[in-house]
Design a protein with these regions (language model features):
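Transmembrane helical elements of multi-pass membrane transporters/channels
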Residues: 28-47, 149, 183, 216-220, ...
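Small-residue-rich hydrophobic transmembrane alpha-helices
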Residues: 60-120, 157-176, 290-354, 386-409
């Protein structure tokens, strides 16, 4: 294992998460992550405004269907990224930089293969996916055109997500914010130009919006990769280290075995969202557009939970790797307090201002605005409960306990959320769908609290495969899909 002299000095934005005051360190790490979430949400929301204002309600409904599919795709690989991030964090806690780079290399090789398969298979099966979603006939052509371009945009998006998560695993949440800002600016600037056309640029309609995402993803990924090498960050690969991109069997097994349950958690959320949008689509285009607009608000409500959860996970992983179990429970408690204050404040603010904000997405359609306002009133507050589950799950996953959170989520999203919505929709109509959200969040929170207190998750060791591999080498490292955004890791 490399000694202290092999460990690069911390770069700008990189933090040692195993020392210092917990609350201050957690906040300092979480704020850039929260900034990334804000940029993602603003990016998706502003683009939804462009689409809604320039192309109308049908186009907005089309992107609502397509964006859920995009979230499903990200979910399919996100678990591997989460497993890699935890391995990187634990190895950073041990100050083993070579192990960090081995994990990153294996992950890059895996993500590159998945990216190529996604483009080819996704383009072919896009029509079938939209039919399964019961996409309204008047929306289908727009959704198909948009979705196929989004499939092409996914490889750069996948790799950007991996690098962003890896950087956070090393304790650097500032660098991802910088390049999230770059991608967001490019996407937002190109959307109106490519949708409506300008000068020699032809009007591409909804395909132009998807093309803007493709260009923004590519620019952001290329710039981030160049920056990593220019600053010689811990996750860069040079010389003989480039062979790490060829997946190592032991590391790949660890990433896949631990990553599949974590990816399945997002797939459960995504599958639930697909099922819910299928129920929503039965109520017509106006309700689908209203639901899509409410989802835009929910991206903002989720931001504190996502940011604090990512910070808690990174801090817990490094402290577990360093053997600092005395700090892990304190990190969790600090995360819960921070999350409750921030999420509760946002819920209150958006409840007061929702009608004004919804107008941006739905224009003068009073019917859709009324439906969206009711959706937000019934379901919006449930994200306070969601935040509690997010923080507790982030801590237990940091030690490799991944099956328990998966089973809890499956129960909350399946029998509870979808089951209640499906059972009561014939009785009380669309309100059954909206009430199922707080029911599912409450079930998830209660079960997660019980698991955190009594689940035995502290006995897990996600880094076992990585640690054993590293030693051998030295002998001869839960959100609702909404908007057009990538998970923040």
């Amino acid at each position: 294992m490399p000694d202290a002299t092999d460990t690069p000095a911390p770069t700008t934005g990189q933090r040692d998460l195993t020392a210092g005051p917990i609350g201050k360190t957690l906040l300092a790490f979480a704020l850039p992550t929260l900034g990334s979430s804000i940029l993602q949400s603003l990016n998706g929301s502003i683009n939804a405004v462009w689409i809604g204002q320039f192309l109308g309600e049908r186009a907005l409904a089309a992107t609502t269907n397509a964006n859920i599919i995009m979230f499903l795709l990200v979910a399919a690989v996100f678990g591997f990224g989460m497993a890699s991030t935890i391995l990187i964090g634990q190895n950073m806690g041990r100050r083993d930089i070579d192990a960090v780079r081995r994990v990153l290399g294996t992950s890059l090789g895996l993500f590159a293969l998945i990216s190529v398969l996604t483009v080819g298979v996704g383009w072919i099966v896009a029509p079938a996916i939209l039919r399964v979603l019961a996409t309204p006939a008047e929306v289908y052509p727009l959704a198909l055109a948009y979705l196929r371009v989004i499939f092409v945009a996914m490889p750069a998006g996948f790799l950007s997500v991996l690098l962003t998560m890896a950087l956070r695993g090393t304790g650097d949440s500032l660098t991802p914010l910088k390049f999230m800002a770059l991608g967001s600016v490019v996407d937002v600037a190109l959307n109106p130009l490519l949708i409506r056309g300008y000068g020699p640029i032809p009007a591409l309609g909804i395909e132009g919006s998807a093309l803007a995402t493709l260009i923004a993803n590519s620019v952001s990924f290329a710039a981030l990769l160049a920056y990593i090498y220019a600053k010689d960050l811990p996750i860069r690969l040079r010389g003989a280290e480039l062979r790490y991109v060829l997946p190592d069997r032991a590391l790949l097994k660890t990433i896949v075995v631990k990553g599949i349950p974590m990816g399945l958690q997002m797939l459960v959320v995504s599958t639930s969202a697909l099922a819910m949008i299928g129920l929503v689509n039965r109520h017509g285009t106006t309700t689908t557009a209203a639901y899509g607009a409410a989802n835009q608000l929910w991206t903002y409500v989720q931001m504190p939970a996502m940011a604090v959860g990512a910070a808690v996970s990174a801090m817990a992983a490094q402290n577990i790797g360093a053997g600092r179990w005395d700090r892990v429970d304190r990190i969790t408690r600090a995360g819960l307090r921070m999350n409750l204050a921030l999420t509760g404040g946002l819920v209150a603010l958006l409840t007061l201002l929702d009608r004004h904000v919804l107008w941006l997405f739905l224009g003068q359609d009073a019917g859709a605005i009324g439906i969206a306002t009711r959706i937000n009133l019934i379901a919006g507050w449930s994200f306070i409960l969601f935040g509690v589950s997010m923080v507790l799950s982030a801590t237990v996953r940091a030690n490799g306990a991944v099956v328990g959170p998966l089973l809890i989520l499956a129960v909350a999203m399946g029998p509870v959320r979808f089951g209640l919505a499906y059972a009561f929709e014939p009785v009380i109509g669309a309100d059954a769908i909206w009430w199922s959200f707080p029911a599912g969040s409450l079930a998830s929170m209660l079960l997660t609290i019980a698991y955190y207190a009594h689940g035995g998750w502290r006995r897990g060791r996600i880094a076992a495969g990585a640690a054993d591999h590293s030693a051998g080498e030295e002998a001869k490292a839960d959100c609702e899909p909404a908007g057009r955004s990538m998970p923040v890791g």
